[in-house]
From Swiss-Prot:
The chain crosses the membrane at residues 5-27. HAMAP family: UPF0154 (MF_00363). It is a single-pass membrane protein. Keywords: Membrane, Transmembrane, Transmembrane helix. One of its GO terms (cellular component) is membrane. Belongs to the UPF0154 family. Its main location: membrane. This is UPF0154 protein MYPE400. It is found in: Membrane. It comes from Malacoplasma penetrans (strain HF-2). Pfam families: UPF0154 (PF03672).
Length: 75
């Protein structure tokens, strides 16, 4: 009887920890990707400011091109 309880605890706890870690990793990755999509690491205004600091006036095409590159790399 005591052996059966010890065996159940000895196998049940590590298996449930592994399953919990896998599920947590999956949902954390999904949440992180959602946050990146909603709040990109750089915005169009930041790109404009970066160009102005370099002494250049960016065209709308350049800004859209840079944003498309960021979105492509985040997928």
């Amino acid at each position: 009887m005591a052996l059966a309880i010890g065996l159940c605890l000895g196998l049940g706890i590590p298996i449930s920890l592994i399953i919990g870690a896998v599920i947590g990793y999956y949902f954390a990755g999904k949440y992180f990707k959602k946050q990146l999509k909603e709040n990109p690491p750089i915005t169009e205004s930041q790109i404009r400011a970066m160009y102005q600091q370099m002494g250049r006036k960016p065209t709308e095409k350049q800004i859209k091109q840079i944003m498309a590159t960021f979105k492509k790399n985040n997928k």
